Amino acid sequence: MSKRAKKRDKSTVEILQVYSASRDEEQMTDLKKTDYLPYLFNLVMPKQFYKSPNRIVMARLYPDVQKHDEQAAEYFEGFQTPCFDLPTKLFPEKTPIDKIVFMPKVMLPMGFEAGGVFGPGVLPRRCYPVDLISPDHKGPMPPLFVGLRGMKVSLSSMINTFLNMYDSPDGKEPHLYEMHATNHHYENDLAPEELMLRPDFTLSVAYTLPASMCLPSPYPYPSVPEQDNIYTPDLSKVLMLMPHQFNITVAILSTVNNPHDPSVAFATMGDDEECPKFELPNDVFPICEGVNRPIFLPKRFMPKGFDACCVFKPGSLSELWYIKRIGRFGTPQEQYNCSITPPLFVGKYTRNAASINMLEEISVHFDQKARECAKSLARLRLDALRLNSRNGSTKGFLVMESDKPTTPAGAYSVESYEEASEDGCVAKVTQECATESTDTRDDGINTADYQSQFPELEPDSEPEPEPEPQTEDEGEDEGDKKCLSCFKVDSDIDLISHAIAEMGVAELSMLGEVDPVPGVDTKLALDQLHEVFETRDEIRSNIDDLMRDHVCRMERDIMLALRQPIRKCSACAKHS
């Protein structure tokens, strides 16, 4: 009893490895209707359990994290699922072992060949592993996963990097570094000359021409977080350096030098542009479907000299493929995420086109850029100094003139229209007199006919005396009462609309010159801004509907991916 009490004083763990066992490969059972069937493919065990000789692993689950997948339970009901015999010493006597629900292999954690779960409250407290539950736990017992780890576990490079990083306290993933597959030596590597002159494809080098120097934007935008679920770069400025012309060439791309371009993604989804396709050699490239399939680019986003090309997104090809097909001789490229394999370009070269002297084109490009930089260097320095002297925060966008001395919420006051123009204001809102007769708007923007709101004078009534004309000094006093307020670009649109509505009748126009922004249809821009003020609630509602539809489609695609049958490799008869 002393040992048991001493064990309870230790900090509780969530994963426990308890026993060694074996299983027949043909041992299967039918999945019956169940109330708890979670998706555990993303459940990763500590690294020590993948190397230990003990193969049975028990893990405590949390119902609010590992939730019941109702659709998967309905779909897999009646399917054959792998099972194994639980050792008699695993649980105490009279434990309801028959209530375990063995899971389909697609829902098991990585590296497990069989496993099942005890639902919430199925196991009594005396049968629950002591090390997996706190002595102060109250209520029903949490669900428990019992799995049989495979004899040989092959984890992906991303999982290995994740486990190694958390094993070492000082492990930090650098932001940029070369592809890890090129930093090690592997046996049976192809010689460089064999790799460069192989008959199936040509290994090329992707060279991105440097962009022109440009002024920094006065409106700083937050950095967009990296995402690898889609990757469609613009390769029109990329030169493919090939040792010799061949029908198909491949090249490693860089997520830093060749970032994802949303405009390319929209072009591939639409029907307006043609995306030429070609058949990839089955003996070279694996069959990738779903989110890992290659994306074929439109013609205007292809490199020079190619009839068609496609891009594999980061992480879609395995590290083993890179080792066997490219090996140590792939050109290292900078990547934002080093824990997954880099993106790959596959292009079909134009056979009838004349060869391009890439080195000469690069030299000409650099000479042209050097001349442009020399001409604009002085102007660039002056503009940069001017931008640095300004406040780094986002400045004005719309200036409003009203009689109220108080500044509206979300705005700041200025002294004159010149100051508003210097802050970047391009539009203005002014208050109109109620006697003017123009079109009426619901939100008060633009002028409106207010004479109908006043009662008509009776015929017998005497006309009111006309007000005496104001003197010049009185007119100046009235003009001094005008208050100018500026709203920023990122100001709340509801605050802007509320401030305009309080003015009653307002007119929206451009500030300053007749055509302050050359090349822009200012009238159309004002109409669009007015429409945004009017229908902002409808726009938000439509966006909410689109986001809900997107979430539903993603959940449906995930379930369809889980229901795909497991394919076997025709060469080795193993699961791919």
From Swiss-Prot:
Which stretches of sequence are listed as region Disordered?
454-481
Is Coiled coil included in the keywords of this UniProt record? no
* Top-level lineage group: Eukaryota
Q: Biased composition, Acidic residues: where in the chain?
A: 457-478
List keywords of the entry alphabetically.
Repeat
InterPro entries on file = DM7 (IPR006610)
Q: Which family does it belong to?
A: Belongs to the DM7 family.
Identification of the protein by name: DM7 family protein GD16138
| Species of origin | Drosophila simulans
